[in-house]
């Protein structure tokens, strides 16, 4: 299987998760930041990791999602919100909507530590972003448990691709 693993990361959280996926998947694979990502055509699976900005995938990832066409797509996100929060769920739904023809193989999201500089800016907003109350609990994430859960989600998606 030929896999393209693309990520956008500002603080290293999403890159860390993308590198874990790269270590998990066998076969021919390419790992690269979104701004250096090749055309996704010709890959059996595209894995895209992104961070959230305003409750949506970051702008570079949003632009890349428009290019995936009907590819098999696995999406994952890191964010300051709690895992399973309405904010995270809505953001993932928005990500899917940016690639309407893609075959969604699976999704995953988890908290990611928010940089102190960004957190300081977010605290000054009126109203504050919906994830701000969850941000302290995101410290130290993604951690080994988050990576293990991502690995489970990816492994669960792979058999569906072989069918």
Report residues per predicted region:
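N-terminal beta1-alpha1 ligand-phosphate binding loop
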Residues: 2-24
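Generic structural signal for beta-strand residues in well-ordered domains
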Residues: 7, 38-40, 66, 97
